[in-house]
Swiss-Prot record:
InterPro entries: NHR-like_dom_sf (IPR035500), Nucl_hrmn_rcpt_lig-bd (IPR000536), Znf_hrmn_rcpt (IPR001628), Znf_NHR/GATA (IPR013088). It comes from Caenorhabditis elegans. GO terms for molecular function: DNA-binding transcription factor activity; sequence-specific DNA binding; zinc ion binding. This is Nuclear hormone receptor family member nhr-89. The keyword Ribonucleoprotein does not apply. One of its GO terms (cellular component) is nucleus. Pfam families: zf-C4.
């Protein structure tokens, strides 16, 4: 039996706590700490604010100080570097900040998702067991879903802006990341090969794999996306699946990510495409949201049928 981790040492929440950066903490506080390392905050109340999970708003300065005082270690935060693709031309536009919620430039935001996509795709190619299209039984469905739990959690904790979200929103975002990591990334890799019609004769799990292959898999094959375009598609879908009800803060952050990602795509394209061609290409990418949203709904239905948590 798993031993409960106890309440968050920062805000005292008991929801979804685990070890983060050296202490027991909730996902919301750990994400806030990760994104606040290089930020400077000001407290109008002389750093005397109370930090409790039932508060609607936190003083960022006091929350960060509480993280440090509670034992969160800066040296435990994973260092990430975001490099430009070798040989890529400089964008004509200067670096632009995404919004007042996201201090990162368009390019930094897209590079985060490129790194996540590359790592997920590499896992699929290194191990056939990571390819969701090979799943045929309820046991395999459970195993492949659980295999992406940690990577999806890590992605959310390192994702820009998520420190403002409540635990419920973070849990929702983890599910969206896991769906993309497990099924859509498999479709991206699998779409390079021929369709496996034998899946049609199998159970509902096999039929779902075939459904993905012949819908979004076929679209990805026809679009012939490079890694920058595919990473942008992943990011746009993650923030726009809208299956679960989310807070106004998450809706607002989703809009900022959408603006940032589409802005990054425009900068990426502007060296070799006209404004009209850019609009058409971005439209082709964003049109996939509906298909992927429908597939997520069908996956949740599949998990419910086999009584497998997702």
């Amino acid at each position: 039996m798993k031993i409960p981790e106890g309440p968050c040492r920062v805000c005292h929440s008991v929801k979804g706590t685990r070890r983060h950066f050296g202490i027991t903490a909730c996902m919301s506080c750990s994400s806030f700490f990760r994104r606040s390392l290089n930020c400077k905050f000001y407290c109008p109340a002389n750093n005397s604010c109370t930090i409790l999970d039932d508060q609607k708003q936190f003083c960022r300065s006091c929350r960060y100080n509480k993280c440090v005082q509670s034992g969160m270690r800066r040296d435990c935060v994973r260092k990430q570097s975001y490099r430009r693709q070798a040989g890529r031309k400089e964008a004509k536009s200067p670096a632009v900040s995404c919004s007042n919620k996201l201090s990162e430039s368009y390019e930094e935001l897209l590079n985060f998702y490129v790194k996540e996509a590359n790592e997920s795709i590499a896992r699929k190619r290194q191990s056939p067991l990571k390819n969701a299209h090979q799943v045929k039984t309820s046991k395999e469905l459970l195993e492949i879903s659980k295999s992406e739990d940690k990577t999806s959690l890590d992605a959310v904790l390192h994702c820009y802006g998520t420190y403002i979200l409540d635990d419920e929103d973070i849990t929702t975002l983890i599910r969206y990341f896991k769906f993309m990591n497990t099924w859509i990334d498999s479709a991206f890799v699998y779409s390079k090969s021929t369709s496996n019609e034998e899946l049609l004769d199998g159970n509902d799990i096999c039929k779902f794999a075939y459904q993905i292959d012949t819908s979004i898999g076929l679209s990805l094959k026809n679009l012939n996306l490079n890694i920058f375009e595919y990473a942008a598609l992943r990011a746009i879908c993650i923030w726009n699946l809208k299956f679960y009800e989310t807070s106004p803060k998450m809706k607002s952050l989703a809009l900022e990510h959408y603006k940032g990602i589409t802005g990054a795509l425009r900068q990426y394209y502007e060296n070799y495409m006209s404004d009209m061609d850019i609009a058409v290409r971005i439209g082709e990418i964003t049109m996939q949201i509906t298909t992927i949203s429908d597939l997520f709904h069908d996956l949740i239905t599949l998990h419910q049928k086999y009584q497998i948590p997702f």
